[in-house]
């Protein structure tokens, strides 16, 4: 390109020189055809064209054309001027063709550069959008994964908590069930024990070791009976002393004074019975009052009282059976002896027996009217006094028989007296053992009564203070 523009400038100096130079573009074209120049980028070509500019070439072109007519005028004398002009024209035409060719090449390159720029500008936001979309998709995927992990963790935690709660509930239920079973077994134990006690009263009657069982049962009785027992012992001793004296007198004296002595013996137990009844009347009254106070002031003790009553019921039942069964043989003996005795003796004895029970009946009526709950205790204690009367009757009958038989039957009477005394001693021993066995329960009840009285006093003091 640069050679093509500079060659026409050297033409005015020598005519032949420019001719040679004019011919040179053919060689240049051939060389360019052989060695194709590397096409610059579209953007570079566009900038070079702007920098160089086409009007400069156009300005330089007319200069050789203007100079050529002058040269022709000056060198008309030289041979072959026409040929030279033709060559110049040809060279000019070639130059114009080359310029046109270059312009044609440059014109399509300019829009290509613009297209590249436009494409790049269009592609950049698309690439950015794609990149943003990819980032958003990645973020969404990460969030979904995190949510799934959180859900799994929460589910695992919920399962763990549910398992722990179930284990805790099972751990709590197992000891509770064991405790309930133990409590039920404990409740069943006394029931079984009571059932065994109720089943074995008949067996205990046949077994000679009644004393041990009675002691075991008697450990739950009440203290107020101690005084009654002491009084009963004293009364028994008093009864035995006149009986012994009577026996001695009977051996020494005839049978005539035996009747008034028998009457005295029958009359002697009369004051004993009212004393026992008075004690019975006096002793249970505070117990009943204490029970009422416990129900009024201490409702919590109701369950304990019920349990104790349940425990005492079989014992009372056993004792009733024992007392009811013990006097049966004595009664049968007494009936036989009374039938054998003479009629006047029976009349006297009936009169004597009819007189003392009258105040006893009045007392019994009063007790039933004022204290209906204590009827069972009174019956039991009256039964205790009955064997003593039967023994007195037996002694009187024996003495009367001996008096009628005379001195021949003294040996038999002595034997009978010894046997009766032994029976009385055995009976007294049994009663003493029963009384001793009843003492510990009596003490416990007395203590409870004292505690209740203290609580009453405290409550009364509080009520007074509040008033």
Swiss-Prot record:
Residues 49-75, 178-192, 220-231, 295-318, 348-373, 380-391, 415-437, 450-467 have a biased composition (Basic and acidic residues). Residues 76-95, 105-177, 278-290 have a biased composition (Low complexity). Coiled coil: none annotated. Keratinocytes of epidermis and other stratified squamous epithelia. InterPro entries: Involucrin2 (IPR009733), Involucrin_CS (IPR019743), Involucrin_N (IPR019571). Substrate of transglutaminase. Specific glutamines or lysines are cross-linked to keratins, desmoplakin and to inter involucrin molecules. GO terms for biological process: keratinization; regulation of antibacterial peptide production. Its main location: cytoplasm. Residues 48-467 are annotated as: Disordered. Directly or indirectly cross-linked to cornifelin (CNFN). Belongs to the involucrin family. Part of the insoluble cornified cell envelope (CE) of stratified squamous epithelia. This is Involucrin. It comes from Mus musculus (Mouse). The gene is Ivl.
């Amino acid at each position: 390109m640069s050679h093509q523009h500079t060659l026409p400038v050297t033409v005015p100096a020598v005519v032949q020189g420019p001719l040679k130079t004019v011919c040179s573009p053919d060689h240049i074209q051939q060389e360019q055809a052989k060695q194709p120049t590397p096409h610059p980028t579209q953007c570079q070509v566009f900038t070079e064209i702007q920098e160089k500019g086409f009007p400069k070439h156009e300005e330089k072109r007319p200069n050789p054309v203007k100079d050529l007519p002058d040269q022709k005028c000056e060198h008309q004398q030289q041979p072959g001027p026409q040929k030279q002009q033709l060559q110049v024209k040809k060279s000019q035409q070639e130059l114009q063709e080359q310029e046109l060719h270059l312009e044609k090449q440059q014109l399509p390159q300019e829009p290509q550069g613009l297209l590249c720029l436009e494409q790049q500008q269009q592609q950049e936001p698309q690439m950015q959008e794609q990149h943003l979309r990819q980032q958003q998709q990645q973020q969404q995927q990460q969030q979904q994964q995190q949510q799934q992990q959180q859900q799994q963790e929460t589910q695992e935690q919920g399962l763990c908590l549910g398992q722990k709660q179930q284990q805790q509930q099972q751990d709590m239920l197992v000891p509770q069930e064991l405790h309930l079973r133990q409590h039920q077994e404990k409740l069943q134990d006394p029931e079984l024990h009571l059932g065994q006690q109720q089943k074995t009263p008949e067996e205990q009657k046949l077994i000679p070791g009644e004393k041990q069982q009675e002691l075991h049962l008697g450990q739950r009785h009440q203290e107020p009976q101690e005084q009654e027992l002491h009084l009963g012992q004293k009364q028994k001793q008093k009864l035995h002393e006149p009986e012994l004296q009577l026996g001695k007198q009977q051996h020494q004296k005839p049978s005539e004074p035996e009747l008034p002595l028998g009457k005295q013996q029958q009359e002697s137990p009369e004051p004993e019975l009212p004393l026992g009844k008075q004690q019975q009347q006096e002793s249970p009254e505070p117990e009943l009052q204490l029970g009422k106070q416990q129900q009024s002031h201490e409702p919590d003790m109701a369950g304990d009282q019920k349990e104790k009553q349940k425990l005492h019921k079989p014992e009372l039942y056993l004792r009733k059976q024992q007392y009811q069964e013990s006097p049966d043989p004595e009664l049968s003996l007494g009936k036989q002896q009374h039938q054998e005795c003479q009629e006047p003796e029976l009349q006297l004895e009936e009169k004597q027996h009819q007189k003392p029970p009258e105040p006893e009946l009045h007392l019994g009526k009063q007790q039933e009217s004022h204290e209906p709950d204590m009827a069972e205790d009174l019956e039991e204690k009256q039964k205790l006094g009955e064997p003593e009367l039967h023994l007195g009757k037996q002694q009187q009958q024996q003495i009367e028989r001996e008096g009628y038989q005379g001195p021949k039957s003294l040996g038999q009477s002595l034997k009978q007296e010894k046997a009766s005394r032994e029976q009385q001693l055995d009976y007294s021993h049994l009663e003493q053992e029963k009384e001793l066995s009843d003492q510990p329960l009596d003490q416990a009840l007395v203590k409870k009564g004292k505690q209740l009285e203290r609580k009453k006093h405290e409550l009364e003091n509080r009520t007074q203070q509040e008033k």
